[in-house]
Amino acid sequence: MLRVARIMKCLTSSKAAALDAELMAPSGGFSIDQLMELAGLSVAQAVYKYDKSLAQGKQVLVLVGPGNNGGDGLVAARHLCHLGAKPVIYYPKRTDRPLFNGLVTQLHNLDIKFLDDVNKSTFDSSAHVIDSLFGFSFKPPIREPFPKVIELLKETKTPTTSVDIPSSWDVDRGPEDDNAFQPSSLVSLTAPKGASRHLLPSTRHFLGGRFVSKHIADKYDLEVPAYEGLDHIVELTQNNKEAQI
């Protein structure tokens, strides 16, 4: 049974950036590789919890952006493949860095398909979509080739999970208008961001952060929930109205 935590406080974008920097500083001891692996594992677990039937070889479309949020999506795709799902990757604007090149190689070694383009048919033929286009460092405008992808996310009826922030949303203020893309579920990483207050009541909200020390939690006034068993995620209650920290 999935444990459901109580409503939690939110981090502002500036606090989230400071927290990430501290985790990767000598005093924090984490590397970007470690944090990306933990994030991607959390996303994969949340998607699996959302629909366990994906493990029966169903197609999961993973939309990958050029930054670390996209790296989280690549890691999630690998884990979902090992869980029995069939990920396909759309990664139109690649990051030429050893970490990202290694993640791509891992997926090629699993015979995971990379797509040259996506359209409505791609979304319709998928059982689930992972939105790992933009993270908490996103600043508008949305540049090519992503405007078309955001429109497809708005229109699709396929269940969609966003990584940390629904793509195109302001990290603190949420969607720019009532016509913005709304995911079926969100996986907040380390702590929820302010945008999560603007999720629809029906949206499932997961937290992935089973690595936060008491020192970090106290410094940033984070609430560390109780995780169940081997889970790296916990499901949060909806309608988060807490003040930002």
Swiss-Prot record:
Alphabetical keyword list: Cytoplasm, Isomerase, Metal-binding, Mitochondrion, NAD, NADP, Nucleotide-binding, Potassium
InterPro entries: YjeF_N_dom, YjeF_N_dom_sf, YJEFN_prot_NAXE-like
Subcellular location(s) of the protein: Cytoplasm; Mitochondrion
Binding positions ((6S)-NADPHX): N68, N69, G70, G71, D72, G135, F136, S137, F138, K139, P140, P141, D164
Any one Gene Ontology cellular component term annotated for this protein: mitochondrion
NCBIfam families in UniProt: yjeF_nterm (TIGR00197)
Residues noted as binding K(+) in the record, renumbered to the chain: N69, D131, S167
Family per record: Belongs to the NnrE/AIBP family.
Protein name: NAD(P)H-hydrate epimerase
Every YjeF N-terminal domain range: 16-224
Domain of life: Eukaryota
Pfam families on file: YjeF_N (PF03853)
Function: Catalyzes the epimerization of the S- and R-forms of NAD(P)HX, a damaged form of NAD(P)H that is a result of enzymatic or heat-dependent hydration. This is a prerequisite for the S-specific NAD(P)H-hydrate dehydratase to allow the repair of both epimers of NAD(P)HX.
Cofactor note: Binds 1 potassium ion per subunit.
Principal place of residence: cytoplasm
Name of the top EC class for this enzyme: isomerase
EC assignment: 5.1.99.6
Cofactor(s) the protein needs: K(+)
Catalytic activities: (6R)-NADHX = (6S)-NADHX; (6R)-NADPHX = (6S)-NADPHX
GO molecular function annotations of the record: metal ion binding; NAD(P)HX epimerase activity; nucleotide binding
